[in-house]
Amino acid sequence: MNIFQILQKISLVPSYLWDKMWAPVWKRCMKHCGKGVYIRPMSSDFKGLWNLSVGDGTSIPKGSTIYCTDAPCTIGKKVLFGPKPTIISGDHRIDLLGKYIADVTVEEKFVDGVNVYDQPVVIEDDVWCGANVTILKGVTIGHGSVVAAGAVVTKSFPPYSIIGGIPAKLIKMRFTEEEIMEHERMLAVKCVK
């Protein structure tokens, strides 16, 4: 190991300690935080923690951006993220004449009594999102799915999908119907033990 590698490792210690110290505080601010959740709050960007739910055993890495607006973000159990995921449950209204986009109020996001610019994001259990994935408002990613690195997910996908691209498209299903049944049976047996 050369001196540069040693210095790099030493420089990570303060960040790690700050994250370790503040993680319990941030977890208490969440709508729900399961057991064994790993987050790096001081090296990530979280907004709207009161609208964020994270299931047991999920790991949210440093460099994450999660913006929960008036719509919730729900992340299931045992979800894996590669570096720098982005999850945003809201959007800006851009169609108001004579008004800067930055000046649009929350009340102005409502059309006929419905906020169409903020919609929930749901990432179900056992999903793996690769590096630099972006998941936008109104999306549900079905359990057991895989999201390829760099994907921008703008619509929902069923369980056991493998998706990728900009915008994300279905690449293929992870398992056949028979394999899904066997996989879920095996997982159910593990849960009983």
Where does each model-flagged region fall?
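General structural signal for secondary-structure boundaries
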Residues: 1-6, 17, 94-95, 100, ...
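Extended, small-residue-rich solenoid/repeat segments and analogous flexible loops
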Residues: 1-46
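Flexible, glycine/small-residue-enriched loop-and-beta-strand segment within the central core
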Residues: 42-54, 59-137, 166, 174-175
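C-terminal/domain-terminus segments
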Residues: 134-171, 175-185
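Short acidic capping loops at alpha-helix termini that bridge into adjacent secondary structure
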Residues: 35, 56, 77, 125, ...
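S-adenosyl-L-methionine-dependent methyltransferase catalytic module, highlighting the catalytic core
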Residues: 184-192
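Short, structured secondary-structure boundary patches
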Residues: 110, 176-178, 191-193
